[in-house]
Swiss-Prot record:
GO terms for molecular function: transmembrane transporter activity. The gene is mdtL. Residues 1-3, 63-68, 114-130, 179-202, 266-268, 314-330, 377-391 are cytoplasmic. InterPro entries: MFS, MFS_dom, MFS_Efflux_Transporters, MFS_trans_sf, Multidrug-R_MdtL. The keyword Transmembrane helix applies. Its main location: membrane. This is Multidrug resistance protein MdtL. Gene3D superfamilies: Multidrug resistance protein D. Residues 25-41, 90-92, 152-157, 223-244, 290-292, 352-355 are periplasmic. It comes from Shigella flexneri. The chain crosses the membrane at residues 4-24, 42-62, 69-89, 93-113, 131-151, 158-178, 203-222, 245-265, 269-289, 293-313, 331-351, 356-376. It is found in: Cell inner membrane.
Length: 391
C-alpha cells in the first residue's frame, strides 16, 4: 500500500511545484526574455490551461489503458517542458514550455486521484486526501524558498532544471515502483455497473460544485492576498511572506488533524463544519473593525478548506470504481476552469479584491450547505472496493 501512497503524493506534487518554484525568478526571467513581469504573469494562466487540456483526455485514457500509461508520459512531458523553458530565449517560447509543463502535470494529477480511488476505501481515502492536502500546502511555502536558495548561486534557468529533476524522480517512481491499479476490464455481468457510473449522477455533480467552489475560495484568496495584505492592510513584503507562511501552517495543522477527526465524526459533519467556517470567514471579513480581526478571518478560510476539501473529493470519487480516471478529470477540469472563470469575471466586472473574497466565501458556504443537506449519497456501488487489479 505504501508504494501507491508515495507514488500518488509524488504525482500530485508536480502541479504546485510547477506553479510556485519559478515565481522567485520572475523579474530576472522577464529581463532576460525582454518581457515585462506583467506579460510573464500570464504564465500562471497558461500553465493552468495546459492542465485543463490534459484533463480532457487523461482520465479517459487512464480508464481504458491504465494508470501507468498516463503517468509515465505525463512525467516525461513535464521533464521535457522544464528543459524547454530553461532554454527559451523569447517569452513566446517560454509560455509554450509552460503550457507543456501544465499538460504533463495535469496527466500526473488525474492519475494520482484515480490511484487513490482504486486502492483505498471511502474512509481511508478521505483521510489520505486530507493528508495530501496538508502536504500540498507546504509547497507554496517551501518552493519559493528553495528557488531563492538556488538563485543565490545559479541563474534562473536552474529553477527549471530543478523541476526537471523532480520530474525525473516521479518518472522513476512511475516506471519502477508504481504497479498498475486500473480495475480489470469488466466482464459482461459488470457492464450494467459500468454504465451506472454516470457523471450526471446528482450526488457526484453536487460534490463537483462543492469542490469547485472551495477551490475558487482558496485561489481567490491566494490571487488577491498581495492586494489585501500589502495594499489595503499596509503590510510590508516581509510581513506578507510571514503571514502567508503562517496561513500555510494553519492549513497543514487542520489537514493533518482531519484524519483523526474522521475517526470521531462523520464525513458529513466535517463538510458542514468546513462550510460554516467559510461563512464565518466571510462575515468576519465583511464586518471586520481591525486588521487583527481580518487576519483571524483569513485563518478561518484556511481551516475551512483543509477540513472539508479532502472529504468532499473522496465522496466525489466514491461512486466510480470503473471510471475513476474520468471522474478525476471531470473534477480537475471543473475546479481549474470554474475558479479561473470566477476570478476573471470578478476582475472584468470590477469587483474589488476584498468584495471578491467575501462574495465567493458567502456564495460557496450557502450553496454547499444546501447541497450537503439535500443531496444524499446513493446506494453504494456493488463490490465497491473489491476490484481485481492488473499485476
Amino acid at each position: 500500500m505504501s508504494r501507491f501512497l508515495i507514488c500518488s503524493f509524488a504525482l500530485v506534487l508536480l502541479y504546485p511545484a510547477g506553479i510556485d518554484m519559478y515565481l522567485v525568478g520572475l523579474p530576472r526571467i522577464a529581463a532576460d526574455l525582454n518581457a515585462s513581469e506583467a506579460q510573464l504573469h500570464i504564465a500562471f494562466s497558461v500553465y493552468l490551461a495546459g492542465m485543463a487540456a490534459a484533463m480532457l483526455f487523461a482520465g479517459k485514457v487512464a480508464d481504458r489503458s491504465g494508470r501507468k500509461p498516463v503517468a509515465i508520459p505525463g512525467a516525461a512531458l513535464f521533464i521535457i517542458a522544464s528543459v524547454f523553458c530553461s532554454l527559451a530565449e523569447t517569452s513566446t517560447l517560454f509560455l509554450a514550455g509552460r503550457f507543456l509543463q501544465g499538460l504533463g502535470a495535469g496527466c500526473c494529477y488525474v492519475v494520482a486521484f484515480a490511484i487513490l480511488r482504486d486502492t483505498l476505501d471511502d474512509r481511508r481515502r478521505a483521510k489520505v486526501l486530507s493528508l495530501l492536502n496538508g502536504i500540498t500546502c507546504i509547497i507554496p511555502v517551501l518552493a519559493p524558498v528553495l528557488g531563492h536558495l538556488i538563485m543565490l548561486k545559479f541563474p534562473w534557468q536552474s529553477l527549471f532544471w530543478a523541476m526537471a529533476m523532480m520530474g525525473i524522480a516521479v518518472l522513476m517512481l512511475s516506471l519502477f515502483i508504481l504497479k498498475e491499479t486500473r480495475p480489470a476490464s469488466p466482464a459482461a455481468s459488470d457492464k450494467p455497473r459500468e454504465n451506472s457510473e454516470s457523471l450526471l449522477n446528482r450526488f457526484f455533480l453536487s460534490r463537483v460544485v462543492i469542490t469547485t467552489l472551495s477551490v475558487s475560495v482558496i485561489l481567490t484568496f491566494v490571487n488577491t492576498s498581495p492586494v489585501l495584505l500589502m495594499e489595503i492592510m499596509g503590510f510590508e513584503r516581509g510581513e506578507y511572506a510571514t503571514i502567508m507562511a503562517l496561513t500555510a501552517g494553519v492549513s497543514m495543522t487542520f489537514s493533518f488533524s482531519t484524519p483523526f477527526a474522521l475517526g470521531i465524526f462523520k464525513p458529513r459533519t466535517l463538510m458542514i463544519t468546513s462550510q460554516v467556517l467559510f461563512l464565518a470567514a466571510g462575515i468576519t471579513l465583511a464586518v471586520s473593525p481591525s486588521h487583527a480581526v481580518s487576519l483571524f478571518g483569513i485563518t478561518l478560510i484556511c481551516a475551512g478548506f483543509s477540513v472539508g476539501f479532502g472529504v468532499a473529493m473522496s465522496q466525489a470519487l466514491g461512486p466510480f470504481s470503473l471510471r475513476a480516471g474520468v471522474a478525476s478529470s471531470t473534477l480537475g477540469i471543473a475546479q481549474v476552469c470554474g475558479s479561473s472563470l470566477w476570478i476573471w469575471l470578478a476582475a472584468v466586472v470590477g469587483i474589488g479584491a476584498w468584495n471578491m473574497l467575501i462574495g465567493i466565501l458567502i456564495a460557496c458556504s450557502i450553496v454547499s450547505l444546501l447541497l450537503i443537506m439535500f443531496v444524499a449519497p446513493g446506494r453504494p456501488v456493488a463490490a465497491h472496493e473489491e476490484i481485481h487489479h492488473h499485476a
